[in-house]
């Protein structure tokens, strides 16, 4: 979201103006996570910590002229992948807004408690497939080369539960 407000709107406006065939996915995590969680025009807090008027990404996208807009919750992998496939089948300028709060921001700044830690421990080929497909930083590879095991490091698990949608 912060990058969209910083430098993405002009590219989107040009895509609409030039009638490009493009699918843009905007990752709306509610903060400027890459540089320390500073506010941006899409959040309700100013740099001084005061409430402010925030810009709604969907309204901005539609205001630029995009009519084909969808919102997804990316931790719902099936729904997100379905929406992506549907949007890929269309033409013109399309935008998907993926809305989930930054886990670090939610836990540190908003003081949200982490949900339950996922309990995943797969063995063999399924373990390697799970590790390769998701590459979660909380996954730990153990076992042997012949019998690999993947488990979850509780201290690193954000509680998103995406692994439960990917692993058997």
Go through the PLM ranges and name each one.
Residues 126-151, 156-158, 162-168:
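Iron-sulfur cluster-binding cysteine motifs and their immediate structural context
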